[in-house]
Curated annotation (Swiss-Prot):
Primary role: Involved in sesquiterpene (C15) biosynthesis. The major product is alpha-farnesene.
Keyword flag Cytoplasm: yes
Pathway assignment: Terpene metabolism; oleoresin biosynthesis
Enzyme Commission number(s) of this protein: 4.2.3.46
InterPro entries linked to this entry: Isoprenoid_synthase_dom_sf, Terpene_cyclase-like_1_C, Terpene_cyclase_plant_C1, Terpene_synth_N, Terpene_synth_N_sf, Terpene_synthase-like, Terpene_synthase_metal-bd, Terpenoid_cyclase/PrenylTrfase
Listed name of the protein: Alpha-farnesene synthase
The record's note on its domains: The Asp-Asp-Xaa-Xaa-Asp/Glu (DDXXD/E) motif is important for the catalytic activity, presumably through binding to Mg(2+).
Gene Ontology cellular component list: cytoplasm
Cofactor details (free text): Binds 3 Mn(2+) ions per subunit.
Catalysed reactions, as listed in the record: (2E,6E)-farnesyl diphosphate = (3E,6E)-alpha-farnesene + diphosphate
Binding positions (Mn(2+) 3): E478
Positions contributing to Mn(2+) 2 binding: D326, D330
Amino acid sequence: MSSLAVDDAERRVGDYHPNLWDDALIQSLSTPYGASPYRDVAEKLIGEIKEMFASISIEDGDDEICYFLQRLWMIDNVERLGISRHFENEIKAAMEDVYSRHWSDKGIACGRHSVVADLNSTALAFRTLRLHGYSVCSDVFKIFQDQKGEFACSADQTEGEIKGILNLLRASLIAFPGERILQEAEIFATTYLKEALPKIQGSRLSQEIEYVLEYGWLTDLPRLETRNYIEVLAEEITPYFKKPCMAVEKLLKLAKIEFNLFHSLQQTELKHLSRWWKDSGFAQLTFTRHRHVEFYTLASCIAMEPKHSAFRLGFAKLCYLGIVLDDIYDTYGKMEELELFTAAIKRWDTSTTECLPEYMKGVYMAFYDCVNEMARQAEKTQGWDTLDYARKTWEALIDAFMEEAKWISSGYVPTFQKYLDNGKVSFGYRAATLQPILTLDIPLPLHILQEIDFPSSFNDLASSILRLRGDICGYQAERSRGEQASSISCYMKDNPGSTEEDALSHVNAMIGDKIPEFNWEFMKPSKAPISSKKYAFDILRAFYHLYKYRDGFSIAKIETKKLVMRTVLDPVPM
């Protein structure tokens, strides 16, 4: 087979804005925060905070309940500040104590002599325990409802009550299927907090509420939450700690240093990624979305341990390559080229590039090298050769891309179910997740890996949620490029007479039903380590975050740019 000639005049292209992050800009970045004195201070603070964990005892509190709340407060804060990895043993011991000695299906009172359950304490304990894998029943919140099934609140909206209802909202967002009381709690708490905001506008509490109302659970990102909570905690005083100023000061100082130490590492990794992008010749591909920096941002928002460099860089490279391939199959590539490229991917032989057009050769080689390198990294941590498994994952994605290319070429609009079955694969969640997770120092034998990989419910739900949300944000732009098939158009085809509003309502309802199911798949007991499930869960949240307001992959110069600045490029003030 001879190489195909390239005729750009006959090709479709997407109307995408150019790369926002020039390589020269990235290479010029600098920061003082990688210096050893900062690391020395961090180590000292870690030791002091460990002592704080150990020093919390019944004698230090007013009573046993105060002691319990102090420990719970510490857990919640070190997690939200992004420093919990230093205190895993302390957190585990504290959680065992909280669950075995203090948790009750009647809620938690605010003092030894009180028989009235406290909403703030109960909601915080419920959320923390559930996220750590403990079995807690949402019926505990029934004691805070009146005979009509409505949540009780005062007319005054005191700061203490507002904090309690904020924690109720945070707890309600991790609902499992069928937990109607948490659905009711979410509606009540959201309404209450929106009404309370004007009364506390400008306060740190209002900043915390605004963040939770905006990002909730599924669009939150660990590093973004850390950045926000550092700003919130700077002036927050909690009633739960005997010496709150001392506790806040030490936690806040460590969080700032850790944030900026990681910021220094991010710059080093980002420079490597940008050089790879430039040296691979991707800048010459004018038809695609250059979002390598944005993908790195997502990776570093969910994998904040310094040792996980292979995860961050691998995720960024693979996702970038995935979006280049998506643009080739959806718009730029001709059908005969796509068939050749698909065959070359399946043969996994660099000699097959001879038959490809020039623009495809570089993409193929970068893809081939990256997948192989990720497999080598994974073998170091997993002890088994993951390449064939990874190749099958990518082949499935390429087949799904090819199917959609045929639909585009013929103007075909499939049934809703046929579209979704293919679209769950073509979104690329599985391909983006598999190899990066295998580079983590978390053993995942094949039989355990398949609890979060295809064809598990975990993977199916994540892929479905992302495909449906992506369609909601992108179907109009895709239609303008000649891509007729989407969950919106397919629903309308299946239901003659229905409107776009009907289709959007149906798709949003599907997502709403799937989120509690996905919460359950994430938090239910299983053989898969909760840490590996957490990374897979956070990858979904990272993608979902960019679809909160619009297609943040295609339009990356608004909210996505702000995310890059707040979590990667800008350190926190010391």
